[in-house]
Regions:
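Residues on the lipid-exposed face of transmembrane beta-strands in outer-membrane beta-barrel proteins
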Residues: 252, 264, 340-346, 385-389, ...
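Flexible loop and strand-edge segments within Gram-negative outer membrane beta-barrel domains
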Residues: 273-275, 316-356, 360-363, 374-448, ...
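Flexible, surface-exposed loop regions and adjacent strand-edge segments
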Residues: 279-285, 369-374, 414-424, 500-511, ...
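Transmembrane beta-barrel strands of outer-membrane/channel proteins
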Residues: 264-270, 355-357, 399-403, 487-493, ...
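Short, small/polar-rich motifs associated with maturation and membrane association
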Residues: 1-383, 397
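Outer-membrane beta-barrel transmembrane domain signature of Gram-negative proteins
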Residues: 179, 320-343, 429-440, 503-618
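Short loop/turn motifs that connect adjacent beta-strands in outer-membrane beta-barrel proteins
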Residues: 255-260, 347-348, 363, 394, ...
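Transmembrane beta-barrel architecture of outer-membrane proteins
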Residues: 164, 188, 245, 335-339, ...
Length: 634
C-alpha cells in the first residue's frame, strides 16, 4: 500500500482535484520502454563503428508485401534504422551483431548478421493480437475482423476522481464532445459522438451496459471490464434509429476460475475553484458608477466622504463592503471514494461482487446552520454482483444484480439563479446580514447570502435497481460447430423522492440610525417564521427482452464466416405520472442481423441491418429498415 499524490485540473468542471490514492498498482516493465522506443517517428543511423560492413535488407509481411517504417535495431547498441516505403533498409554492422526487427502488430524477430550482406525478413502477425476480441453491437468479434469505427478506452484513463463516469470522458477519445453543465456535487456531463445528428432533445448516444440500455452514470468505473464507442453506420446499423447518435458499449467485470481475489481502493481528495469571474471591488465599482452618473447627469452619485465610509468599513450596516465571491465560496471541499470487490470461482460457478461509496462536498460557504443544515453534499452507494453458472458443459446461466443509492443535500432553490444574483449584486448593495441579526435585503434586487443560507433546503433520494438474467446454449456438438443461442431478460426500477423544506423569512432594508444609534428599518419583503414542507415522487420501470442466434466458424484455415440474427423488445413505463404526461407509449421492438466473411483474416466483408419499430410514430411510419455494408483490407 502506498500513498500517491495525484493532481488533476478539470477545466470542464472548473475544479482542481488533488487525489491521494492509498492503494494503487504500479507495473514497471523494461520491455515496455523498449517497445515505446521502437515506435518513435524516426530512428537515425548512428555511425559509431566505421569498421563494420554495410548490410542491405527488406522487411515483408506474411503475404510478401513490403512493410514501411519497420524498426531495425542493433542489439545492445544505440544504432538503428527504419525501412523506407519499399520496406528496404541499409545499415552498417559487424558480423557478430544481431538485428532486432520489429513492427506494430508483428512478432519481433532477432537475426544474426554473420556473413549475410542482404537480409530478407518475413514478419508474422502477433497471434494474441489477431485472436483478441472486441465488444461490438450485440456481441463480440475478433479485433482483426472489425471493419466499423470502434474505439476502446483504457480503464486507467477512465479512473478519474469524479462522481459520474460521464464527467471523466473529456479528452479521452477523438470525436467525443463533452459538456459539463453544472459543477454541483454529483453532477454528470452531457456528451455527443461526432457532433449532434438529431434535432430536438433526443440527441444523446445510446448507452448499453451488458447489452441493456441504461445510464452510464450508474456504473462504477471499478466494475468496468471494457468500454467501447461505436461511431459509424457499419458499427451502429443493428440498433436502427436508436443508434443514430452513436453507441457506447460497457461490459462489466465477471468472475474467473480462480481462488478468491480481493481488491480494495481508497481515495481522499480536495476540490477548489480554479477559475472564477473577476468582479469589480468596492472602489472600482464606485468609480465606474460615478463615471456613468457624471457623464449622464453631471454629478457624482457617491460623494468622496461616502466613498470613504464604504472603503473604511466604519459602518458596515449602512455602508457595506462585501466581496460576494469570498463570502459565498470556501477555499476547498473534500471528496472520498472507497471501493472493494471480490472475484473468483470454480469450473461450475464464477462470481464477481463489488461495492463502493463516494462522497463529495461543495465549495459553497454555508455559514448559518443553527436552524437547519443547507450545506451541499452528495453521497452514492453502489453494489454489483455478476454470477455465471455452467448448468451443463454447453449451457451457461448468468445472473447480474446491481443497485445504486444516491442522496443529495442542497440549499432550496436554483443554484444557477444564486450564481446570477452573486454576479449582478454590487458590493455596496447590502450587507450579508445586519449586525443585530436582522436579515438584509436591498430596496431593489436580492441578497445572495439569503438565497444560500435563509431559503430552506432540499433533500433528494434516488434509487436504481437493475437485474439481468441470461441463458446461453452452445449447439456446436448438437447441431453444427460455432452455433450458439442466447436469451436475455432484464427488469430495472428507478425511484426518486425529493423533500423541500422552504423558508420565506421577512427581510429588511436599513435607511439610517436613530438618535440612540439603532438602525432604522424598512421591510423589504414580508415572510413567515414557519417552515413549509413539500415533496415529490417519481419513478420508472423498464423491461428488456432479447433472443439471438450467433454463428462463427473457420473453414479450411482460410474462410471465416459469421452470422447473427436477433429479436429485441423494450417497454418503458412511468410509475408516477403527474398532471402532465408527454407520451403514453414507450415501446420499441425490432429485429437485427449481421453477416461477416473474411479470407485469410486479410480481406473482410460485413453486412448489417436493423428493422425497428416504435409506438411513438404514426401507424404507417412506425417501422424502418436500416442496412449497412462494408468491406475491408488489412
Amino acid at each position: 500500500m502506498m500513498s500517491d499524490l495525484r493532481k488533476n485540473i478539470f477545466s470542464i468542471k472548473i475544479w482542481t482535484v488533488t487525489t491521494f490514492c492509498l492503494l494503487s498498482l504500479v507495473n514497471m516493465n523494461a520491455s515496455n520502454a523498449l517497445a515505446h522506443s521502437l515506435q518513435k517517428d524516426e530512428i537515425k543511423e548512428v555511425k559509431d563503428n566505421p569498421s563494420g560492413k554495410k548490410v542491405t535488407g527488406k522487411v515483408l509481411d506474411e503475404f510478401g508485401e513490403p512493410i514501411p517504417s519497420a524498426s531495425i535495431l542493433v542489439e545492445g547498441r544505440s544504432r538503428g534504422v527504419i525501412t523506407d516505403l519499399d520496406g528496404t533498409f541499409v545499415i552498417e554492422v559487424l558480423p557478430t551483431d544481431k538485428l532486432v526487427v520489429s513492427f506494430l502488430g508483428m512478432e519481433t524477430q532477432t537475426i544474426l548478421v554473420g556473413k549475410q550482406t542482404n537480409i530478407v525478413v518475413k514478419m508474422q502477425p502477433q497471434t494474441a493480437e489477431l485472436d483478441e476480441v472486441t465488444v461490438v453491437a450485440y456481441g463480440k468479434q475478433r479485433k482483426a475482423s472489425v471493419i466499423g469505427a470502434i474505439n476502446t478506452v483504457s480503464m486507467n484513463e477512465l479512473k478519474m476522481p469524479v462522481a459520474k463516469l460521464s464527467s471523466g470522458l473529456a479528452g479521452q477519445l477523438a470525436g467525443i464532445v463533452v459538456m459539463q453543465r453544472s459543477g454541483e456535487p454529483g453532477a454528470g456531463a452531457d456528451f455527443w459522438i461526432r457532433g449532434i445528428n438529431t434535432f430536438g432533445a433526443g440527441n444523446k448516444p445510446l448507452v448499453l451496459v451488458d447489452g441493456v440500455e441504461r445510464s452510464m452514470d450508474l456504473v462504477d468505473v471499478e466494475d468496468i471490464a471494457s468500454f467501447s464507442i461505436l461511431k459509424d453506420a457499419t458499427a451502429t446499423a443493428l440498433y436502427g434509429v436508436r443508434g443514430a447518435n452513436g453507441i457506447v458499449l460497457i461490459t462489466t467485470k465477471r468472475g474467473t476460475e480462480s481462488a478468491p481475489k480481493i481488491n480494495a481502493r481508497v481515495e481522499y481528495g480536495f476540490t477548489n475553484p480554479v477559475r472564477m469571474p473577476e468582479l469589480a471591488n468596492t472602489e472600482q465599482w464606485i468609480n465606474y458608477y460615478n463615471d456613468i452618473t457624471l457623464e449622464s447627469s453631471g454629478r457624482l452619485a457617491i460623494q468622496p466622504e461616502e466613498k470613504a465610509k464604504y472603503l473604511n468599513n466604519t459602518d458596515p450596516d449602512l455602508y457595506p463592503n462585501v466581496d460576494w465571491m469570498q463570502t459565498l465560496f470556501k477555499d476547498f471541499s473534500n471528496t472520498t471514494r472507497v471501493n472493494i470487490n471480490v472475484t473468483g470461482g470454480s469450473p461450475k460457478i464464477r462470481y464477481y461482487v463489488g461495492g463502493s461509496f463516494y462522497s463529495e462536498g461543495s465549495v459553497f460557504n454555508i455559514s448559518d446552520k443553527d436552524r437547519y443544515d443547507a450545506s451541499m453534499r452528495y453521497n452514492k452507494f453502489s453494489f454489483r454482483s455478476n454470477i455465471d453458472i455452467n448448468v451443463t458443459s454447453s449451457t451457461e446461466l448468468s445472473l447480474s444484480l446491481s443497485n445504486q443509492y444516491e442522496t443529495k443535500n442542497r440549499p432550496y432553490g436554483s443554484l444557477s439563479d444564486l450564481y446570477a444574483y452573486m454576479i449582478r449584486t454590487s458590493p455596496i448593495a447590502t450587507p450579508t446580514i445586519y449586525s443585530d441579526g436582522t436579515l438584509a435585503k436591498p430596496s431593489t434586487g436580492t441578497n445572495p447570502y439569503n438565497s444560500l443560507n435563509n431559503s430552506g433546503y432540499s433533500q433528494d433520494f434516488f434509487n436504481n435497481a437493475q437485474s439481468l438474467i441470461s441463458l446461453t446454449q452452445d449447439f456446436s456438438k448438437m447441431v453444427t460447430p460455432g452455433l450458439k443461442a442466447n436469451v436475455k431478460f432484464s427488469w430495472d426500477a428507478y425511484n426518486a423522492h425529493t423533500l423541500n423544506r422552504i423558508v420565506t423569512p421577512s427581510t429588511y432594508y436599513a435607511t439610517g440610525r436613530d438618535e440612540e444609534g439603532n438602525l432604522d428599518f424598512v421591510r423589504s419583503t414580508e415572510g413567515s417564521d414557519y417552515m413549509k414542507l413539500t415533496r415529490t415522487n417519481s419513478g420508472t420501470r423498464t423491461i428488456n427482452f432479447e433472443a439471438s442466434a450467433n454463428y462463427d466458424r473457420l473453414f479450411g484455415e482460410k474462410h471465416r464466416v459469421g452470422a447473427l440474427f436477433l429479436f429485441s423488445m423494450r417497454n418503458y413505463t412511468d410509475n408516477f405520472p403527474g398532471n402532465y404526461v408527454d407520451a403514453f407509449a414507450h415501446k420499441n421492438i425490432g429485429i437485427a442481423g449481421r453477416a461477416t466473411y473474411s479470407y485469410y483474416d486479410r480481406y473482410f466483408a460485413e453486412f448489417n441491418f436493423g428493422y425497428n419499430g416504435s409506438e411513438n410514430f404514426a401507424p404507417d411510419k412506425r417501422f424502418g429498415f436500416f442496412p449497412s455494408f462494408a468491406i475491408g483490407y488489412m
